[in-house]
């Protein structure tokens, strides 16, 4: 599969996370944004091999661009070590350092993986494998993973982490092989992402002004595609990923009747998201209302759900609910 520069850039944006990708898009010209978004939407999936090739090329380009700042290529380092330690010992040390770097680069992949996917990926592995990887992960990612483990397993892993000293050099190659096999057996979350879904996630993380500017540019080129992106952005199921403090702010500014309608036919997970952010009396009343089999049209339910999503976008952008600014959130 031969990729052009735009397609490689699209894959890179799809792999670095919505927050980082949105920051990149803000610094591009309208034409560049259009080109990148079009490529992202057309890429339904890509293999781990392609992802690694793109990331490797990006790393090489960065290294070449910065070689005047830091001579860190293998030949230079090998030359220094050979002159210092001799050819044999210098090569042994360099190999050990490179193995350590390669393992850390493999582990770095997990920093961009959804915690639930990460846990699923390592579910059948020995706890020490999970412990070792968590020791080298970004601390915020490690905390997200630990918080999703069962109490028993979390305690075991934390104890192992506390007793962890370092990984033996002789075990580095084995660990690297284990990680590579894990990634081969199951798809990375990057490979599973649909182009439209990825674009929607990136736009959702932007300020409303930036989001609407990009949507307008896309709409000029492809109105049907714009509708699909907007539809993906406005998924009521995504509410389960919103922080509780924003849900509480929403509830305090939302008519209870509208919430009752919006929650008709929703899953238990979504309902519990609201129940746990209400006082017990309100939660009980809402639960009883939802158990009653009164007929409400799908259109009415969708309208109230869209209102809630618009209000949440308002709250996320402003920190509070702003009635004055509400109008600009209607797409």
Swiss-Prot record:
Function statement: FliG is one of three proteins (FliG, FliN, FliM) that forms the rotor-mounted switch complex (C ring), located at the base of the basal body. This complex interacts with the CheY and CheZ chemotaxis proteins, in addition to contacting components of the motor that determine the direction of flagellar rotation.
Give an example GO biological process: bacterial-type flagellum-dependent cell motility
Which segment of this protein is annotated as the motif Part of the EHPQR-motif? 125-128
Indicate the transmembrane segments per the record. none
Question: Molecular function (GO) terms listed?
Answer: cytoskeletal motor activity
Query: Which keywords does this chain's UniProt record carry?
Result: Bacterial flagellum, Cell inner membrane, Cell membrane, Chemotaxis, Flagellar rotation, Membrane
Describe its membrane topology.
Answer: Peripheral membrane protein
Location of the protein in the cell: Cell inner membrane; Bacterial flagellum basal body
- Please provide, in alphabetical order, the Gene Ontology terms of the cellular component aspect for this entry: bacterial-type flagellum basal body; plasma membrane
Chief location of this protein within or outside the cell: membrane
- List, alphabetically, the Gene3D superfamilies matched: 1.10.220.30
In chain numbering, the residues marked as site (Part of the EHPQR-motif) are: 160
Name of the protein in its database record: Flagellar motor switch protein FliG
Q: Which InterPro entries match?
A: Flg_Motor_Flig (IPR000090), Flg_Motor_Flig_C (IPR023087), FliG_a-hlx (IPR011002), FliG_M (IPR032779), FliG_N (IPR028263)
Family membership noted in the UniProt record: Belongs to the FliG family.
